[in-house]
């Protein structure tokens, strides 16, 4: 065959490839898409015996189409594996990286474990060292899988490699993304000093070395979210306020109508085509951390208001595209609102919303959300059982929570509630054992100031029940010192009302009144019906002692009102179909039918995401409350 004939044949084949690809794309983008004909066009390419690169790319495209538009996962896998086997040995050919990334996603969808996905990505990371974009993208994807498997040290190491690679390529924006992602992983590991060092380093780069103002604002939001979460994890509600305010201002800037689209901001340079979360999801996340802050500070009305707004925003985003991260946000918000409801005495609403959280978890593919939130759900059901005086059920729920979770704060929280159950059921041996264990585990390790304040509160409650009033005062003053330092209003009100009861028990009515008055003022602001019930009983006794008949009557009337509200709510609880959840101790939670969660909560209405975990723990907002020291 002559050279001219060969050239002519090649040109003819190229024309066929281009025509078939164009036709395939036409069918894919038709309204509605004609995927069958699109696949037929791509399949026809193979009849021309195309060159290796064309063949590999076509197999990749077939895999992409099958994954996106059909349920034929096995055929998608075959095409992707073929694309990988052809492209892997070919130098300077990006198809291998795209294929590896997709194959890893497919393995995660279909395999029982992540071993194959990790192996595929590790090989692709090795091969991509001369391609900074793909090297960084694959490192992020692999670190995400390790983080999801709670292999945090490996995830952290990969993110450190990514930061170095970005630095060597002078990709400053990308380097900061890696630094902040690593800070998030270290936060989960409770390596507080390392977190601070990384945040400080990233903060200086954001301030001084990011010339693009829009990218700078995005990084600032990521940085501030981590800073706020860092302070909240330490229970530092007062310290966090300036950072939270700055975060709220930054998100308003990003959500303004004149703000450019993500595609405009991140589409110009390949090494800047990475965002942590799209701005619409960041908006929900800022609501979420605001809810967490309001809960810890003891502002239940605010927490409810922001939860409702966030859930409304989530429903709007779900209507556009139901991203898995939205379900994560929804579950965490529901976990917070459940605690709100119980503090305010709305336990029937609380069990409805626990059921709603269960439904979201059960709807996620492969029960992935249920695995991550099962311990939290057991903990919430334990609190609900405790508040409805089902102590045996509550104990079993907390024991399951402790056995399932690896989060130390959640474990501490559940153990403190177990201690209160043992206190109320007069199981002194079990109580001593759990308090000793909590003390040993948390003396020399990092813990939330709110939770450690709660630990002192439980010890004060224990001393009060033993009639060791001097010891009770010592513990409760320690609790008050910690609570007042960081404006932990619920911890303050609980400590004050218990301290008032201590003084009442030793006949010091003046000091008792000095404690119960601010306790009731705080409780009405929160509002916390349990502290109000307890405080009104103390006030009734104090006014009787001082022979103040009218004030005694008023206090008694208030006590009856709070008590009747709780009794009426208790009646609704036991009649609710969702009440059956108290009997869930293992496996999948039972399906219960009943009224949905409060209607107001369920109102209707490219860049690469470096989607490392967003929220490390959903238990940070839990604080002590209740007449007998229940924790919410």
Swiss-Prot record:
Name the InterPro entries on file: MAU2, TPR-like_helical_dom_sf
Spans of TPR repeats, please give: 453-486, 493-526
Just give the chief location class. Answer: nucleus
Tell me the keywords, alphabetical order: Cell cycle, Cell division, Chromosome partition, Mitosis, Nucleus, Repeat, TPR repeat
Q: Does the keyword Repeat apply?
A: yes
Q: Does the keyword Membrane apply?
A: no
Q: Name one GO cellular component term.
A: SMC loading complex
Reading the lineage from the top rank, the first entry is Eukaryota
Q: Name one GO biological process term.
A: chromosome segregation
The protein's location, in the record's own words, is: Nucleus, Nucleoplasm
Biological role stated in the UniProt entry: Required for association of the cohesin complex with chromatin during interphase. Plays a role in sister chromatid cohesion and normal progression through prometaphase.
PANTHER family found in the cross-reference section: MAU2 CHROMATID COHESION FACTOR HOMOLOG
Q: Which family does it belong to?
A: Belongs to the SCC4/mau-2 family.
Q: How does it assemble?
A: Interacts with Nipped-B to form the cohesin loading complex.
Protein name (database record) = MAU2 chromatid cohesion factor homolog
